[in-house]
Regions:
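Short, Lys/Arg-rich flexible segments
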Residues: 2-31, 89-96, 114-122, 127, ...
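Short loop/turn segments at secondary-structure transitions that flank enzyme active sites
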Residues: 51-53, 81, 90, 115, ...
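Assembly/oligomerization interface modules of large self-assembling protein complexes
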Residues: 2-83, 288
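Residues immediately flanking
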Residues: 86-88, 179, 275
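Alpha-helical scaffold segments that mediate packing/assembly in large oligomeric complexes
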Residues: 85-168, 291-292, 296-297
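Extended, compositionally biased alpha-helical segments that mediate assembly or anchoring
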Residues: 256-297
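Short helix/loop capping segments that flank catalytic or ligand/cofactor-binding pockets
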Residues: 53-56, 94-95, 184-187, 282-284
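Extended oligomerization regions of viral-like shell subunits
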Residues: 148, 152-255, 260-264, 277
C-alpha cells in the first residue's frame, strides 16, 4: 500500500449556514474536572493514602515518628481517532457549500472525541464498537459505592450517593447526570403538584445542584455501549479524576491510500478527513465517587 499523503486542513472560525446537525451532548467529565498539562506516555502520580498527624512535644521530650503513606497511580495514554470520508463531488462544489459541509464534519469529529473521554473514562469502552476495551484497565464504572433509585425519588438517590462520598472522606464537588436523571429531578413534584426544583427547567441545561457543579450528558449512561449500563449519575470529588491532552493532532485531509480499510481513496473518488487526540486518563481513588443507578426492574 502506498504511503498516505496528507495536507493540512484549516477550519473556519464560523461554520457556514445551511447544514443541519443533530445536537449532541459533550463530555461531562471535561466539564466537572479541568484538564491538566501532561507529557506523552504513562505518568505516575503520588497519592497521599495516610496523612501525617501532629504531636505535642514536651520541653526536652522526644519526638515520635509521624508515619505518612503514599501510593502510585498511573495516568495512561489513550489514543483516539475519527475518520470520515466525503466524495470528490463535495470537494468540487463551490467554496461556500464545500466549507459548510467540511466544517460540519470537522465539528462532529470534535464532538466525537469529546464524547470519547466519557465513554473511556466512565465505561472503559471503545466508542466505535461499544465494547469494553482491554487496554483500559480502570473507569468510574468500577466505583463500588452506589445509591439505587427508588421509584421517582431522584433527589434522595443523589443525597445517598453524596453521603457515601462524604463517608469516604471526600467532598462531593460535582454530579454527572444522564438526561433521564436530570429530567426526572427537574420534574419532581410535591404533594400539592408543585415542582420542587423549578429552577432546573427540564433538566437539559443544569449547571449546578445543591451546591455541586452539574453536567448533563447521555455519555453517563453510555448509549454507545453494547452492554447496557445501569448508571444514570455519578457524584464525586472530581479532581480525583485526572485527564489531559497529551497530543492533539490537527485535523487533516487524506487524498491517497486506504486510511481506514474501506478501499483506495483515488479509486473510489473520495477524500478522508481525520482528527486524532491522545488523552491521559487516570483515577486517583475510586472511593471519591459514588454511582447513582437505575431503580430495580
Amino acid at each position: 500500500m502506498a504511503a498516505l499523503i496528507t495536507s493540512n486542513f484549516t477550519m473556519p472560525q464560523e461554520y457556514a449556514a445551511g447544514v443541519f446537525k443533530k445536537a449532541q451532548s459533550t463530555s461531562a467529565l471535561a466539564q466537572l474536572s479541568g484538564a491538566m498539562p501532561q507529557k506523552f506516555g504513562k505518568t505516575n502520580v503520588m497519592v497521599l493514602t495516610s496523612a501525617p498527624k501532629a504531636e505535642i512535644v514536651a520541653e526536652g521530650g522526644e519526638k515520635s515518628p509521624t508515619p505518612t503513606a503514599y501510593a502510585n497511580k498511573t495516568i495512561s495514554p489513550i489514543k483516539l481517532q475519527v475518520t470520515a470520508r466525503v466524495s470528490n463531488e463535495v470537494m468540487w462544489a463551490d467554496e461556500d457549500y464545500q466549507m459548510g459541509i467540511l466544517s460540519d464534519v470537522g465539528e462532529n469529529c470534535g464532538i466525537a472525541l469529546g464524547r470519547a473521554l466519557d465513554i473511556v473514562g466512565i465505561h472503559k469502552a471503545n466508542p466505535l464498537t461499544g465494547a469494553v476495551a482491554a487496554s483500559v484497565t480502570e473507569g468510574l464504572c468500577d466505583a463500588t459505592d452506589k445509591a439505587q433509585l427508588a421509584g421517582t425519588k431522584f433527589d434522595e438517590a443523589i443525597e445517598a450517593a453524596s453521603g457515601l462520598v462524604i463517608a469516604n472522606g471526600y467532598t462531593p464537588t460535582g454530579i454527572a447526570c444522564d438526561p433521564a436523571l436530570s429530567f426526572g429531578l427537574a420534574t419532581m413534584r410535591d404533594t400539592t403538584g408543585r415542582r420542587i426544583y423549578p429552577e432546573l427547567g427540564y433538566g437539559q441545561g443544569v449547571a449546578s445542584f445543591e451546591g455541586m457543579t452539574a453536567a448533563v450528558s447521555d455519555t453517563v449512561s453510555g448509549k454507545e455501549l453494547t452492554k447496557a449500563s445501569d448508571i444514570i449519575g455519578l457524584v464525586g470529588q472530581f479532581d480525583a479524576f485526572r485527564w489531559g491532552v497529551q497530543r492533539e493532532i490537527a485535523m487533516h485531509t487524506i487524498e491517497f491510500g486506504d486510511p481506514d480499510g474501506l478501499g483506495d481513496l483515488q479509486r473510489l473518488n473520495q477524500v478522508a478527513i481525520r482528527a486524532e487526540i491522545v488523552y491521559g486518563i487516570g483515577i486517583l481513588d475510586l472511593k471519591a465517587f459514588a454511582k447513582v443507578v437505575k431503580a430495580a426492574a
